[in-house]
């Protein structure tokens, strides 16, 4: 039906409804609805337009055209009707209400009221406009009157200014005459006048601007407004509001002409007038008003020449006033009174004031210069003031006065001071007397010259400044640096340096982005560092070279290059960097690179321009990068286009100081790390600590008293006496040894007969030696040394030191075999080995068999020889240690014997006479030197001359040198004389050959006729050489004797389950040994594990009793024991034919589910009527259906894709998840997992849950599998998920598959990824992944606000079978990123092998179906592993970046940058659910077909067209099953009502009790708060019904507040 109603008066029709052939017809704007009535209105207007009845109808406020002959109109409250009869038209203005329904009548009356309100508003507006026009006319008249008044005042002002100018001119002439007279007067008293004139000018220069007056006629201060001074200074112009604020007053403020822009002021004034008065722009009245206002505000302008005249005249006037004032004061001597009063006030105590006041009165009476008395009252002590008064009264007795003062002051100082302050008191007295002399002479001079008081003050200040201030400024101070160096610096230099430093700070503070400051070049501080995998940049700091850790890549040796110098150096140490995956490597600075200049640390680290000093790709020519760098959380970010090989380069600031180190680039972002705090902590803090300790020791040393020093001297004297006694005892032993050796040489034959007896008595002698050593240990330290030497020499002669007690045990006892012997024992013959290979045993299996055989052989050996496994079987190492010690003793004794005149021990000993002609021995500390000569008799005389030259006359300490000459029967022995070993040279005259052997001892052999030889041997041994000869322990590197087995055990590195890393007992645990639940501390890991399992278990609700022992795991229940249950299979049951089936394992599990669950508790509620969803049921076909996702489409290999887009996705994904950097490996016993889940096959044959398994068997299997590093495959148990699905999916047997495996495998993955997963749950507000988010408390609104953008559209996408279609290559890539984000200390080869094994078993899976079939599934992310959702989020982010780059490339023919993606897009994701916001300026249109094809062809992933939706706004989008809508200005969620309420009629599981039913209903009510009233009322009704039944049954339920459901959604 055609219907229309007129709209409000003045409204216009929408453009979409305007006729195409012309403008809108008059009267059409009164129609309520134009749909279908335009033609009707045209027809009626054409037919009745001139009729009075039609005109009456058109005078109504609202018109309703009912048909071509009838219309109804409403005016005010009357309803009239228009009709067309055969005889004409009629209009009845009232009584037509019966022709309308109540709703239509109400609607038309509302429209009429609206029109009336609009009419009233127009009338009110017209009245206001008329009143404004009248006010404007009155304002215009007032302005005219104001202009007339201003003109009159202006005339009066001009006359007044002219008169004032004339008076001012006359006043100036009078002042000039007065000034001329003053100058004449000054010439007569030149000294006084000149001094006074200088003071006047100085004073006037200071106060000129404070007392400046405007006396010029043109520049007189205005009564109202500002005074404008002509100036060309470059100052910003004032706005109209500034001029109003400054000049709209009577203060006479000054403004410069350059601040006044007349055109701008007029324009701003007119705009302000338009704003306040409400008229249109360009009103002539406003223009005139603004011109008058500006003239009023700025009435007077002055030139700079006029200001100079003002300055001169005011200065002269001020000088005259001050001069007259001073004359008055001087005439009445008021200056002296003021000075004396000031002097009296300076008295520091009553005694001094009493003594100063008489002096002041005397000085006033005698006309003494006041300044001198003031000085005397300040600098002189009270005791010398009487001499000052005497000098004032009797100035002619100065020498006598000074003499008496000198005697008095010195005597008084001597007798009144104690011994400590005597020197100070006498010095002070002498200084006082000298000051008295100088002061007396100054008073006489001032009185003779009659210098005015002002000149006296200035003269005193100038003298004090020059003598004290300048001298102090140029004085030299001594600065002692921490390294002990001293430096003398003048104070002026310090001030200059301080000013330079301040200027540098100001310069640095003015650094702004966009202006690159200049900086020094620090290329002289960098070198090239080459490691195993590449090269980088190194730089010097202090006395080391530093570079980045990834440059070295674990190399122990690196090559340093600088220009033509190349040195291979060993890495000193690796320093960990806080929150950084890289490290800092320290390399020692060699002497070849001492010329490299060190860098100094920056004083301030902030966003600024930094310089990166590096090399070009050729690593020869140096390059510099400079630009703005941002410092954030200890990292440096910039956009430098760095090259390969720039890693490790230093960042320096504008002063050339070190800020940080370059790590690398990701895309267009270069990244570095700040090193200031690290280097301060590692180096400067240690040096400061050493300096502090040194200073403490120095201070402590200064506290030693004189008595303590004397005590120390007495103790040292006692030691000297003891040393003398020891030396005498040693000399006595030497003489006894000499006699003993002679006796031994005569009885060699007897010794040969007694050898057998000595061997038999060897054990007795060793026991005797042990008792002797015990007695020696009880002796005082001073006698122990001598006794030890005696015993060792004695035993050496007897040949007993070769066997200690322990060595004897090894020699006489049975020699046992070690376990290492059995570990290398051959257990299989060649035939047995070949047979095992033919039978199909793998090399690993054969090795396992051999190891078991070797272990059994070792156990049999222990049993046969009655040896305990814990006995000390390291006898071989201990025996070697004993032999080493014995050899060391032998070497020391032989050296002592040789240096005392004997050869090394042999069967027959010879004296020097038998062996050598000359033997020189020098035994100085740290330098032992011997020279021996063997020659033929014919050259003995020549060597005798050399001997006499070698022995000098200088005396040495007793026992430090021996010189022996043995020729025939004559022997010369000279002791304790300086010996020059260089004088002994071989005599080569007549020699056929001369050969030298420069080894550890330099030997020269001269061969003569008949092969006769002369031998000269020189040997030098130092303490360093002796130290190098010591043998070290192969485990710890120490030379001291100790238990090698214990040392090896403590240094063996083993994997620690608590720390998650490999370390030894010496290194200690990296984590505190505290219980994770109660924080109790423990001494070792075993105690803590026992406590965690038995007393304070975190994983078990009911832990075992403390006395309980865990049972060993039965055979066949281990993680890899499923292979023993595998049987051959004959045919496929549920697995498709294209899937490989490995075998069959019989299991008793549900295969089909055909019946639904019936819950009796649900009879208490009314069912929700829907026919879309139901609980999942399936047949055996469902297992065949679930394999379809693995064969949807084959993905491309990543090698076929452009590496640029792959790198872009990788870089974005790493930056997105950089908060995981440095994540930790959680100990496997501390991982958190659902204990009530199935333990998988084969464990579920015995244990229903992991909780039951842990309570029975404990953690042993977890630790073993982690430690051994398995390579076998675990078995995945597959079952179908029971959930609510669409009935269409249930009919198609399209049920989701869940995979779970052995809990040991799951917790290994949890150890690597649990910490990262928990970090992702904390970052939902600022990152894409939403694991752990909540839609409540404004959660949806905050994410909607984050996604919202003015030019954005929104894409909702949901993949089909997302988990199963993830390409294996992409999944490995994601897992590699997760391993990369671990802390570097966990990235060991062992952990990498464990993680790779874990990842490969996630991809290449062996799966057991409920039908018993065991098959292989390759690819995808199993939907039951520990990190399924987190891994899916990683994949989602990576794919989204790839998708955006793909669409962007299609539109712009280039790839976007990471910054562009972050700026123009944002999204949130949860597993396979994603909501994307894209700016139209980034990607204009979202091509859904291209996206679907891209995912299928590139990745083999399934995206259905129905699962991609594009929205222009956030209203109606869905995420995680909730549709977003607005309520009270905030976004909230609406769930899928039919799906969640279907469980009230068709549940997937039974509820345990009525409380659970009530809780389920409350949860559903909470989710449906934003739904329609029908849903809310239904749930409220069910909750009330259940609550009533619970109350009748006596069950108490919680109470819920009235606003609980609504307020929980809003933030």
UniProtKB/Swiss-Prot annotation:
Cleaved by the viral and host proteases. The protease is probably autocatalytically cleaved. Residues 1352-1486 form the RdRp catalytic domain. The record marks 168-169, 508-509, 795-796, 915-916, 1027-1028 as: Cleavage. Its EC number is 3.4.21.-, 2.7.7.48. Signal peptide: none annotated. The chain crosses the membrane at residues 195-215, 329-348, 353-373, 375-395, 397-417, 426-446, 450-470. Keywords: ATP-binding, Coiled coil, Covalent protein-RNA linkage, Host membrane, Hydrolase, Membrane, Nucleotide-binding, Nucleotidyltransferase, Phosphoprotein, Protease, RNA-directed RNA polymerase, Serine protease, Transferase, Transmembrane, Transmembrane helix, Viral RNA replication. It catalyses: RNA(n) + a ribonucleoside 5'-triphosphate = RNA(n+1) + diphosphate. Belongs to the astroviridae polyprotein 1AB family. This is Non-structural polyprotein 1AB. It comes from Turkey astrovirus 1.
């Amino acid at each position: 039906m055609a219907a229309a109603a007129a709209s409000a008066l003045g409204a216009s029709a929408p453009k979409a409804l305007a006729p195409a052939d012309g403008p809108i017809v008059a009267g059409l704007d009164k129609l309520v609805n134009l749909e279908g009535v335009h033609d009707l209105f045209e027809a009626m207007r054409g037919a009745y337009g001139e009729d009075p009845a039609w005109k009456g109808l058109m005078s109504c406020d609202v018109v309703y055209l009912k048909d071509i002959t009838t219309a109804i109109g409403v005016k005010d409250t009357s309803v009239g009707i228009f009709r067309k009869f055969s005889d004409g038209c009629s209009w009845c203005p009232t009584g037509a209400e019966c022709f309308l329904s109540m709703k239509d009548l109400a609607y038309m009356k509302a429209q009429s009221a609206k029109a009336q309100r609009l009419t009233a508003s127009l009338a009110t507006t017209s009245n206001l406009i008329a009143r404004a026009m009248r006010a404007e006319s009155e304002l215009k008249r007032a302005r005219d009157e104001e202009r007339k008044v201003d003109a009159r005042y202006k005339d009066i002002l001009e006359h007044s200014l002219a008169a004032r100018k004339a008076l001012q001119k006359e006043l100036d002439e009078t002042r000039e005459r007065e000034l001329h007279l003053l100058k004449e007067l000054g010439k007569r008293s030149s000294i006084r006048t000149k001094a006074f004139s200088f003071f006047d000018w100085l004073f006037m220069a200071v106060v000129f601007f404070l007392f400046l007056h405007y006396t010029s006629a043109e520049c007189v201060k205005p009564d109202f407004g500002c005074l404008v001074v002509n100036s060309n200074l470059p100052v910003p112009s004032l706005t109209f509001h500034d001029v109003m604020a400054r000049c709209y007053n009577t203060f006479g403020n000054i403004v410069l002409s350059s601040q006044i822009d007349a055109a701008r002021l007029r324009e701003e004034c007119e705009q302000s007038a338009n704003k306040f008065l409400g008229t249109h722009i360009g009103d002539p009245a406003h223009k005139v008003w603004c011109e008058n206002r500006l003239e009023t505000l700025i009435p007077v302008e002055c030139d700079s020449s006029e200001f100079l005249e003002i300055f001169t005249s005011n200065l002269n006037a001020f000088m005259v006033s001050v001069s007259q004032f001073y004359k008055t004061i001087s005439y009445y001597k008021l200056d002296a009174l003021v000075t004396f009063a000031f002097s009296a006030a300076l008295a520091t105590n009553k005694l001094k004031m009493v003594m100063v006041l008489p002096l002041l009165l005397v000085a006033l009476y005698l006309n003494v210069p006041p300044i001198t008395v003031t000085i005397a009252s300040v600098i002189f002590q009270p005791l010398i003031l009487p001499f000052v008064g005497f000098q004032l009264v009797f100035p002619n007795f100065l020498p006598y006065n000074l003499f008496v003062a000198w005697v008095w002051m010195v005597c008084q100082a001597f007798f009144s001071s104690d011994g400590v302050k005597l020197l100070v008191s006498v010095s002070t007295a002498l200084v006082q007397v000298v000051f008295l002399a100088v002061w007396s002479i100054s008073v006489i001079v001032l009185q003779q010259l009659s210098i005015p008081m002002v000149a006296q003050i200035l003269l005193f200040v100038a003298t004090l400044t020059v003598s004290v201030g300048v001298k102090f400024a140029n004085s030299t101070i001594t600065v002692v640096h921490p390294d002990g160096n001293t430096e003398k610096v003048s104070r002026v230099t310090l001030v200059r340096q301080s000013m330079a430093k301040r200027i540098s700070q100001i310069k640095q503070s003015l650094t702004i982005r966009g202006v690159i400051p200049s900086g020094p070049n620090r290329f002289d501080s960098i070198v090239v560092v080459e490691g195993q995998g590449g090269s980088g940049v190194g730089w010097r700091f202090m006395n080391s070279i530093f570079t980045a850790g990834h440059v070295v890549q674990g190399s122990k040796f690196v090559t340093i290059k600088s220009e033509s110098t190349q040195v291979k150096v060993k890495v000193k140490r690796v320093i960990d960097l806080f929150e950084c995956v890289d490290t800092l490597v320290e390399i020692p600075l060699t002497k070849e690179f001492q010329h490299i200049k060190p860098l100094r640390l920056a004083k301030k680290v902030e966003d600024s321009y930094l310089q990166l000093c590096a090399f070009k790709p050729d690593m020869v020519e140096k390059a510099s990068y400079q630009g703005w760098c941002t410092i954030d959380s200890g990292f440096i970010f910039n956009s430098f286009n760095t090259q390969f090989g720039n890693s490790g380069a230093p960042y320096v600031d504008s002063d050339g100081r070190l800020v940080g180190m370059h790590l690398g680039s990701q895309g267009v972002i270069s990244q570095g790390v700040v090193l200031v705090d690290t280097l301060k902590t590692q180096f400067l803090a240690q040096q400061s600590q050493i300096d502090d300790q040194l200073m403490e020791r120095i201070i402590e040393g200064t506290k030693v008293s004189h008595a303590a020093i004397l005590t120390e001297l007495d103790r040292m004297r006692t030691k000297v006496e003891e040393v003398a006694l020891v030396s005498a005892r040693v000399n006595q032993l030497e003489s006894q040894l000499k006699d003993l050796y002679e006796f031994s040489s005569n009885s060699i034959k007897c010794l040969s007969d007694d050898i057998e007896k000595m061997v038999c008595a060897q054990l007795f002698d060793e026991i005797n030696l042990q008792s002797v050593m015990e007695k020696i240990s009880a002796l005082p330290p001073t006698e122990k040394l001598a006794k030890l030497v005696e015993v060792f020499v004695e035993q050496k002669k007897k040949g007993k030191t070769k066997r200690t007690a322990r060595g004897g045990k090894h020699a006489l006892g049975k020699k046992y075999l070690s376990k290492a012997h059995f570990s290398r024992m051959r257990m299989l013959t060649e035939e047995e080995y070949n047979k095992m290979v033919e039978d199909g045993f793998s090399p690993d299996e054969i090795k396992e068999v051999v190891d078991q055989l070797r272990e059994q052989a070792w156990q049999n050996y222990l049993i046969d020889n009655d040896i305990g496994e814990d006995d000390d079987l390291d006898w071989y190492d201990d025996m070697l240690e004993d032999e080493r010690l014995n050899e060391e003793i032998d070497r020391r004794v032989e050296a002592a014997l040789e240096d005392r005149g004997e050869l090394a021990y042999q069967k027959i000993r010879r004296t020097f006479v038998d062996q050598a002609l000359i033997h020189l021995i020098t035994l100085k500390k740290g330098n032992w030197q011997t020279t021996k000569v063997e020659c033929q008799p014919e050259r003995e005389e020549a060597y005798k001359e050399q001997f006499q030259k070698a022995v000098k006359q200088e005396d040495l300490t007793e026992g430090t040198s021996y010189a022996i000459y043995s020729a025939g029967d004559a022997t010369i022995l000279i002791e304790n004389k300086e010996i020059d070993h260089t004088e002994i040279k071989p005599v080569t005259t007549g020699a056929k050959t001369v050969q030298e052997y420069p080894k550890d001892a330099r030997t020269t052999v001269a061969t003569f006729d008949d092969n006769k030889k002369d031998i000269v041997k020189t040997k030098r041994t130092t303490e360093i050489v002796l130290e190098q000869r010591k043998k070290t322990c192969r485990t710890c590197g120490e030379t001291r004797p100790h238990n090698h087995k214990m040392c090896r055990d403590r240094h063996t590195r083993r994997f620690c389950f608590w720390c998650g890393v490999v370390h030894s007992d010496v290194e200690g645990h990296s984590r505190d040994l505290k219980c994770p639940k109660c924080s109790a501390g423990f001494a070792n890991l075993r105690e803590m594990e026992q406590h965690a399992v038995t007393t304070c278990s975190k994983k078990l609700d009911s832990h075992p009793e403390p006395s309980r022992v865990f049972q060993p795991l039965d055979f066949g229940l281990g993680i890899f024991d499923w292979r023993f249950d595998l049987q051959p299979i004959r045919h496929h049951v549920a697995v498709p034919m294209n899937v490989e089936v490995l075998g069959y394992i019989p299991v008793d599990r549900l295969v089909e589910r055909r019946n639904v669950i019936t819950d009796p508790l649900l009879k208490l509620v009314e069912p929700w009527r829907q026919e879309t969803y139901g609980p999942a049921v399936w047949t055996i076909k469902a297992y065949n259906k679930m394999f379809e996702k693995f064969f949807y489409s084959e993905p491309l290999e990543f090698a076929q894709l452009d590496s640029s887009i792959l790198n872009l996705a990788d870089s974005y994904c790493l930056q997105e998840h950089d908060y995981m950097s440095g994540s930790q490996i959680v100990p496997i016993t501390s991982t958190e997992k659902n204990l009530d889940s199935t333990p998988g096959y084969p464990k579920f044959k015995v244990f229903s849950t992991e909780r039951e398994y842990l309570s029975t068997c404990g953690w042993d299997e977890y630790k073993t599998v982690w430690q051994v590093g398995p390579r076998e495959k675990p078995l995945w148990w597959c079952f179908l998920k029971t959930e609510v699905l669409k009935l269409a999916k249930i009919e198609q047997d399209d049920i989701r598959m869940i995979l779970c495996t052995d809990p040991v495998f799951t917790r290994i993955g949890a150890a690597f990824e649990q910490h990262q997963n928990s970090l992702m749950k904390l970052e939902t507000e600022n990152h894409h992944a939403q694991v752990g988010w909540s839609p409540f408390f404004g959660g949806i609104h905050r994410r909607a606000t984050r996604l919202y953008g003015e030019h954005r559209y929104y894409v909702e996408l949901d993949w089909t079978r997302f988990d199963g279609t993830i390409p294996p290559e992409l999944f490995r890539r994601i897992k590699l990123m997760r391993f990369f984000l671990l802390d570097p200390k966990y990235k060991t080869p062992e952990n990498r092998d464990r993680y790779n094994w874990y990842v490969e078993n996630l991809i290449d899976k062996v799966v057991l179906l409920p039908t018993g079939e065991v098959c292989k599934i390759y690819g995808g992310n199993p939907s039951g592993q520990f990190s399924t959702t987190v891994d899916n989020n990683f994949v989602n982010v990576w794919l989204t970046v790839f998708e955006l780059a793909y669409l962007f490339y299609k539109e712009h023919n280039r790839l976007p940058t990471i910054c562009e993606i972050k700026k123009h897009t944002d999204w949130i994701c949860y597993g396979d659910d994603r909501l994307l916001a894209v700016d139209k300026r980034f990607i204009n249109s979202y091509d859904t077909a291209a996206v679907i094809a891209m995912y299928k062809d590139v990745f083999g992933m399934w995206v259905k067209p129905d699962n991609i939706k594009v929205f222009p706004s956030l209203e109606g989008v869905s995420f995680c099953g909730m549709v977003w809508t607005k309520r009270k200005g905030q976004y909230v969620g609406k769930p899928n009502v039919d799906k969640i309420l279907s469980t009230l009629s068709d549940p997937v599981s039974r509820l345990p009790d009525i409380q659970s039913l009530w809780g389920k209903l409350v949860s559903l009510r909470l989710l449906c708060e934003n739904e329609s009233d029908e849903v809310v009322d239904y749930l409220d009704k069910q909750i009330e019904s259940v609550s009533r039944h619970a109350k009748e049954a006596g069950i108490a339920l919680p109470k819920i507040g009235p606003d609980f459901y609504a307020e929980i959604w809003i933030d």
